[in-house]
């Protein structure tokens, strides 16, 4: 056994008594060379009705040993098997079907049987020296949402381990990510999920993975050998370690809000109906839109989530958590997770989707909805206010907004620019979705314009802006306009307060051929179009320079609401004659002495198809961004109190 791990676990348990209780509840398999202990928390199981079966194979064959577990108190059942069982497999059965348990840490192929492993054997060389990349504030993060398979499955990727964890350890992949400048990867589900058959990997299969089966085991289809329980664990750790060495944090997509199904789930086969919410009519509630919703407010489900988060931090060195449909979970549980994580490392960032996918069987005011985020200190949420102000409403792919040159969402964008805080110059009555500020500090807002859900940015722009697909316009002109609008969209994201987030591949104008939700689309839709790096080199260069500009200038990364209100002031949109102009938003970051090398910054977004003039504080300025080009050393100089902003572009000026 790993003595260092045991010491750390003991110290952590002494600090976190709640977690210790959870460890006792969910530590279902304890291995040593001399014996293996099995414990299952199954409160509703009848007398002598819990069976454990041992197998020599992770999928095939009959059990070579079957044991009746003995009751240990009111809720737990136990059994001890002498001898070295490493390499064997097991299942529990309370009469509802075999299960590897609720908290299996290793499994056979397809996750139907638990695996007996020594986790120390899964640590790659140097794992004990792996270090979490440092950040001073969540605002320092540049989050890159990535699907493991998408990144490398195309033969044009030039990577050896196509579609695998190990692709992210290859020098070419690491160099690409470092060159782009991102410092955090939010991986779409990497836990063991049910929607890909790991025994049929010779056939192309794709799924996003929001179909949880075993929450605490890495997905096997991304490993080089899903039949080997330790391989997926070790290769996942190798990926994490390689990214950490490159200065890139790893964020886990936590999908605790539902399971793939109910009757076949490990929860249901261990403690029937406990882990799920039901309606007043006795039906399973479906706030997830996936057929069920879990009951985070129940003590055992809350303990499970706490212990699972802690396990991914301790065993896999995870640096952050994105909670899928966070609005299904209760506020108290989410705050308990934040407080526990703070005691481990407060720099571990937690954020989520502040909504559900349907009505939940729990009071809305007690759920971790975006509107309740002010009660979740230190937990972020996605700003759909900002997203839809730019691209258009989620309900209609073909309807545009500011990026289409359509007025009406200027205040919604301004609300996103300040990071979702209360600001005297933001008229909340004109904000699209929220009429009250929902963050305490800008670091609780995820600023973005697209993610894996719905159309990717390029497809959405083409669907909502007719000129981008009008064959009467030359392809050269359509491409030039697409580039302008795409760059303008991301400039809004990266020069706003909050935590910037992009969908992986957007830096190369990735598209998904117009597919609205590509959760089970083939690789031809989801894979990176690596040839685009040669086709649109200016896109990658712009993204890279935009990311670096944000990293170089703390003024775009203010960490508190008070600092934003003190330093960020919106500019009037009227022209020199006092006429109001639409689709034009500008602001200044002022009095930046001691904060930024640039003492005064002006940022203007022009969503119109015509050049616009805007009034600015009179002075001499250096141009850092203009017409889709960024150069912090300066593209030229401007003097006076009025500037021209090119069509569909951003202008960034500064004074030293």
Identify the meaning behind each predicted range.
Residues 40, 46-59, 63, 611-628:
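Beta-strand-rich binding/interaction modules
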Residues 114-117, 121, 338-339, 347-509, ...:
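Conserved alpha/beta catalytic core and glycan-binding cleft of carbohydrate-active enzymes
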Residues 147-171, 175-316, 329-345, 349, ...:
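Substrate-binding/active-site clefts of carbohydrate-active enzymes
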């Amino acid at each position: 056994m790993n003595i260092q791990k045991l010491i750390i676990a003991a110290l952590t348990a002494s600090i976190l008594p709640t977690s210790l209780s959870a460890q006792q509840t969910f530590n279902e398999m304890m291995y040593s060379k001399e014996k293996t202990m099995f414990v299952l928390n199954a409160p509703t199981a009848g007398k002598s009705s819990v069976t454990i079966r041992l197998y020599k194979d992770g999928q095939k064959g009959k059990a070579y040993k079957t044991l009746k577990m003995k009751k240990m108190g009111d809720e737990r059942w136990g059994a001890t098997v002498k001898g070295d069982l490493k390499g064997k497999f097991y299942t529990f059965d309370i009469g509802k079907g075999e299960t590897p348990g609720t908290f299996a840490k290793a499994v056979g192929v397809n996750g139907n049987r638990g695996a007996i492993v020594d986790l120390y054997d899964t640590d790659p060389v140097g794992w004990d020296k792996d270090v979490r990349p440092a950040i001073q504030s969540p605002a320092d993060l540049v989050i890159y949402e990535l699907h493991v398979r998408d990144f490398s499955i195309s033969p044009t990727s030039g990577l050896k381990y196509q579609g695998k964890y190990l692709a992210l350890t290859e020098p070419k992949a690491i160099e690409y990510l470092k060159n782009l400048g991102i410092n955090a990867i939010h991986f779409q589900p990497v836990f063991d999920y049910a929607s890909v058959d790991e025994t049929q990997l010779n056939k192309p299969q794709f799924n996003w993975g929001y179909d949880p089966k075993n929450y605490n085991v890495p997905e096997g289809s991304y490993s080089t050998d899903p039949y080997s329980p330790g391989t997926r664990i070790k290769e996942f750790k190798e990926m994490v370690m390689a990214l950490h060495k490159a200065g890139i944090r790893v964020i886990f997509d936590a999908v605790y809000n539902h399971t793939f199904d109910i009757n076949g789930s490990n929860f249901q086969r261990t403690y029937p109906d406990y882990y799920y919410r039901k309606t007043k009519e006795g039906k399973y509630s479906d706030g997830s839109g996936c057929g069920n919703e879990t009951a985070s407010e129940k003590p055992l489900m809350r303990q499970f989530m706490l212990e699972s988060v802690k396990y991914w931090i301790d065993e896999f060195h995870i640096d952050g958590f994105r909670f899928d449909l966070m609005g299904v979970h209760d506020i108290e549980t989410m705050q308990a997770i934040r407080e526990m994580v703070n005691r481990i490392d407060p720099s571990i960032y937690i954020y989520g989707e502040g909504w559900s996918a349907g009505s939940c069987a729990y009071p809305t005011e007690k759920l971790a909805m975006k509107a309740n985020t002010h009660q979740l200190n230190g937990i972020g949420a996605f700003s759909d206010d900002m997203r839809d102000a730019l691209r258009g409403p989620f309900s209609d792919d073909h309807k545009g907004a500011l990026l289409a040159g359509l007025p009406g969402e200027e205040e919604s964008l301004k609300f996103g620019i300040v990071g979702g805080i209360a600001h005297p110059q933001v008229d909340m009555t004109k904000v699209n979705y929220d009429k009250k500020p929902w963050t305490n500090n800008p670091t609780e807002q995820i600023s973005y314009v697209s993610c894996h859900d719905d159309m990717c940015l390029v497809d959405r722009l083409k669907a909502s802006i007719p000129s981008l697909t009008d064959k009467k316009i030359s392809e050269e002109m359509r491409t030039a306009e697409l580039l302008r609008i795409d760059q303008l969209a991301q400039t809004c994201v990266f020069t706003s307060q909050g935590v910037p987030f992009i969908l992986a591949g957007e830096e190369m104008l990735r598209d998904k051929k117009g597919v609205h939700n590509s959760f089970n689309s083939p690789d031809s839709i989801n894979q990176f179009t690596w040839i685009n790096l040669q086709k649109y080199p200016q896109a990658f260069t712009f993204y890279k320079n935009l990311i670096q500009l944000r990293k170089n200038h703390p003024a775009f990364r203010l960490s508190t609401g008070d600092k934003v209100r003190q330093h960020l002031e919106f500019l009037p949109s009227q022209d020199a004659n006092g006429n109001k102009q639409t689709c034009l938003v500008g602001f200044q970051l002022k009095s930046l002495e001691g904060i930024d090398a640039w003492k005064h910054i002006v940022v203007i977004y022009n969503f119109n198809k015509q050049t616009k003039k805007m009034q600015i504080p009179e002075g001499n300025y250096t141009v850092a961004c203009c017409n889709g080009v960024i150069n912090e050393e300066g593209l030229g100089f401007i003097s006076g109190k009025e500037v021209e902003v090119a069509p569909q572009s951003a202008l960034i000026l500064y004074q030293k």
